[in-house]
């Protein structure tokens, strides 16, 4: 996929990054947004703020009265994104904020049909023009630009690292929200795009998780920080197109992980079977039953299932949602809220 409008749903920093805080920094580098009208949102945020030591000045209590599933981009821009960014600026936190963390009971899908050019509206690719809350927050500059849906450009995320011939990033670069990134991902002084990492602590509506499930995950992830538990990162391959198209890149990625002193393995099947050391996972299947695998997800693990509807929490959506990983003990996961670019 060249571009995915995916919902990052993490326990560690989020329900992930805030967990170990390497990618986005420490508690002073994130901004926590809470739906002040939702007891679930407040409960999840309180648990997270306590576990992570979030300063009160880095918390915004926002009374969200709109849908907690989907809203128009105009509503997102005026009633959610702009108030968040204005609060960050008003509190003089902009130089230090790298990540916007949403608690539960905010919309996970942003509908931008009203801003789609007429020439694109007839294309099957844009039949359901939507982006995720976290993806559209990361691309806040494009969303606020007034230049049309420039976020549709597959190259809109310039923080993405270019890959070498083996499919492994050529280099890595610690993220800073005040950095500007050029067309090749290079940090520039006065040109290029700025971004903000963004995650959700959880979704408590529809096919999401319960508040106790989310809080248990937050607690387990916090307890795992810095412990470097022994475990294995698994890459699952089978005849499903979701894995076949990516499996050639698995061996070099496994080697790169092992060069860091972490075990990694390519396994065949739908899920890792009877593995008690799942420290990370990449797989691809429409539906799965994790308990039936008899495998154990370790605290702090990031688990990904590359499929079309994993980030959709509408009860009738179909396909297994990413919340199944959280329920099984994963620290974080992500999923698309609309069919991604292939």
What are these model-predicted stretches?
Residues 23-342:
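Cysteine-dependent hydrolase recognition
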Residues 5-6, 141:
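Generic early N-terminus positional signal peaking at residue ~5-7
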Residues 1-3:
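N-terminal secretory signal peptides that target proteins for export/translocation
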Residues 6-18:
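Bacterial N-terminal signal peptides
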């Amino acid at each position: 996929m060249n571009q995915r409008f995916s919902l990052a749903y993490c326990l560690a920093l989020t329900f992930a990054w805030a967990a170990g805080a390497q990618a986005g920094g420490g508690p002073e580098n994130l901004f926590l947004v809470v739906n002040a009208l939702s007891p679930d949102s407040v409960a999840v945020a309180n648990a997270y703020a306590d576990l992570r030591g979030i300063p009160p000045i880095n918390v915004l209590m926002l009374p969200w009265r709109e849908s907690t599933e989907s809203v128009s981009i105009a509503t997102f821009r005026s009633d959610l994104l702009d108030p968040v960014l204005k609060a960050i600026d008003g509190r003089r936190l902009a130089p230090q904020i790298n990540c916007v963390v949403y608690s539960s009971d905010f919309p996970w899908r942003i509908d931008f049909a009203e801003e789609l050019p007429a020439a694109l509206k007839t294309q099957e690719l844009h039949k359901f023009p939507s982006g995720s809350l976290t993806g559209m927050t990361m691309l806040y500059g494009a969303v606020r630009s007034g230049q049309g849906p420039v976020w549709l450009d597959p190259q809109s995320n310039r923080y993405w690292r270019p890959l070498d011939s083996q499919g492994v990033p050529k280099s890595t670069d610690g993220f800073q929200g005040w950095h500007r990134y050029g067309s090749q991902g290079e940090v520039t002084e006065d040109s290029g795009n700025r971004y903000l990492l963004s995650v959700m602590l959880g979704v408590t509506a529809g096919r999401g998780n319960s508040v106790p499930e989310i809080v248990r995950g937050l607690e387990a992830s916090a307890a795992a920080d810095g412990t470097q538990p022994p475990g294995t990162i698994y890459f699952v391959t089978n005849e499903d197109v979701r894995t076949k198209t990516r499996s050639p890149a698995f061996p070099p990625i496994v080697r790169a992980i092992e060069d860091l002193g972490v075990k990694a393995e390519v396994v065949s099947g739908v899920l890792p079977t009877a593995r008690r050391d799942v420290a990370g996972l990449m797989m691809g299947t429409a539906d799965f039953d994790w308990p039936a695998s008899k495998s154990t997800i370790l605290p702090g693990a990031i688990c990904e299932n590359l499929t079309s509807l994993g980030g959709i929490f509408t009860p009738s959506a179909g396909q297994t949602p990413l919340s199944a990983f959280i329920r099984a003990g994963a620290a974080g996961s992500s999923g698309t809220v609309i069919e991604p670019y292939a």
